[in-house]
Regions:
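Edge beta-strands of extracellular beta-sandwich domains
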Residues: 112-122
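Beta-strand-rich structural segments
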Residues: 56-60, 105, 142-160
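Short, solvent-exposed loop/linker segments at the N-terminal edge
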Residues: 46-51, 136-145
Length: 174
C-alpha cells in the first residue's frame, strides 16, 4: 500500500520485520507438533473499556484451556469440529475487561494442566527493551541480527498503544 509506514501488504501472518502476527499462532498451533503454542489475544491494555465485553481468543495446540481474569475463572473451552471458528481457536466471547491480568491454563487430553500464559495490563511507558534474535555474530561485515524494540512499563509489560517513533543512530562505520 502507499499508506505510511506500510511499504508492502498489510496481509499475511508475519510482518516485514519477521515478527509473527496473531494469526501466525493459529497455523503454528495446528502444524507445529514439536513446539508448544499458547497465544492469547488481544492484549489486555484497554483504557476506557472497563466493564465492557472484550472477547478473548486463544490459539493453542492443546485441546482445552481455561481463562482467568484477575483470578476469576471464565470457564474451560475445548476445541470442537462444530464449525471452522471452533475447530482452531478457543473463544470466551463474554469476557469483561477489567485492568489486571488474564491467565490461560492449557490442559492435555487427560485433563492435566500442562501450560500457562499470563498477559498483564500495561502501566505508563517506562523504558525500551532491545531483544536480539542472536547472542553472537561473526565479525565478517556480513552477519546480522534482528533487534526487536519494545516499549514497556516499569514491570516489563508491553505497552501496545505507544506509537511514538524511536530513532537509532549507529556509531559503527563499516
Amino acid at each position: 500500500t502507499n499508506a505510511w509506514p506500510n511499504h508492502s501488504s498489510m496481509f499475511g501472518i508475519i510482518d516485514l520485520a519477521s515478527i509473527p502476527k496473531d494469526r501466525y499462532y493459529l497455523y503454528r498451533s495446528v502444524w507445529n507438533k514439536k513446539a508448544e503454542t499458547l497465544h492469547i489475544l488481544p492484549h489486555w491494555t484497554w483504557p476506557g473499556r472497563e466493564g465492557k465485553v472484550t472477547p478473548v481468543f486463544v490459539y493453542t495446540n492443546h485441546p482445552t484451556a481455561e481463562l482467568f481474569i484477575n483470578g476469576k475463572s471464565y470457564g474451560k473451552q475445548s476445541k470442537n469440529n462444530s464449525s471452522l471458528k471452533n475447530r482452531y481457536r478457543l473463544m470466551w466471547i463474554d469476557a469483561v475487561y477489567e485492568p489486571g491480568e488474564i491467565k490461560v491454563v492449557a490442559y492435555n487430553k487427560d485433563g492435566k494442566a500442562v501450560a500457562e500464559k499470563i498477559v498483564r495490563t500495561a502501566g505508563k511507558p517506562h523504558h525500551i527493551e532491545l531483544v536480539s534474535n542472536r547472542n553472537e555474530l561473526t565479525a565478517d561485515g556480513k552477519d546480522l541480527a534482528y533487534i526487536t524494540v519494545k516499549v514497556v512499563d516499569k514491570d516489563g509489560n508491553l505497552c501496545p498503544a505507544d506509537s511514538r517513533q524511536i530513532n537509532f543512530l549507529s556509531l559503527i562505520h563499516i
